[in-house]
Amino acid sequence: MTSAASPVRSAAHLKVLSAGAVKYVLTDFAPRFTRDTGDQIDFTFGTIGGVQKRLRDGETADIIMGTAPAISQMEQSGVIAAGSRVDLGRTLTGICVRADTPMPDISTPDGFKQTLLKARSVAYTNPQAGGTSGIFLVGLLERLGIAEAVGKKALLCINGDEVVDKVSAGDAEIGSTFLSEIVPMKAVKAVGALPPPMQNATAYAAGIMTGSSNPEAAERFIAMLTAPAQRNAWLSLGFEPAGHG
């Protein structure tokens, strides 16, 4: 008597709603995930403030990725399924210039301050749009006493991609956003992270949205994304991965 064949798992179609800082890690990994599992993924990226607004407006997803405090709050409020939160890693705020221009000195707090003051224009994410790096930078400028001077020549952007675009096009002399949004881009070069005394590592996490229609596939995606085998990919794209495995 022949035993019945195991049912074939049908491919899932995952929807991921994510903060932009993780964008290039995800888009680098997604083709390999689809090749290995057959599952398809649709991404929607924005600032964490934009992600939160989409959720308030009733948008749904299978996976949500954002700053670690925001994901923890979503888990506490029931937006994310209890126990599904996973740390992804952290990235630093950095400075970029066009690929064909000299590198300014930001190795010290004073060097960083003078670089911003001397720059013709500075692009960064709009804090009012919920851009994490922009919120941090504006607070730092206020502490340094140069918020007004830099603000007069600021180009406020909707996300890190626009920051990079402004710099690569020559509209902004200097750009500031997360290194994970700078390092993958060829048209600009990373000057580096802000000097240690004023640096703020931003941690990111993921979780499965309560009511996801594909919780098993979502869990599989997060597990494969954070596996030790992916560590070098995270590092090469400006992220320090969390210590999974």
Per-region residue spans from a language model:
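Internal catalytic or translocation cores that form aromatic/hydrophobic pockets or channels
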Residues: 63
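Exported/periplasmic ABC-transporter solute-binding proteins
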Residues: 1-44, 49, 53-60, 68-69, ...
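Short active-site loop at a secondary-structure junction
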Residues: 83
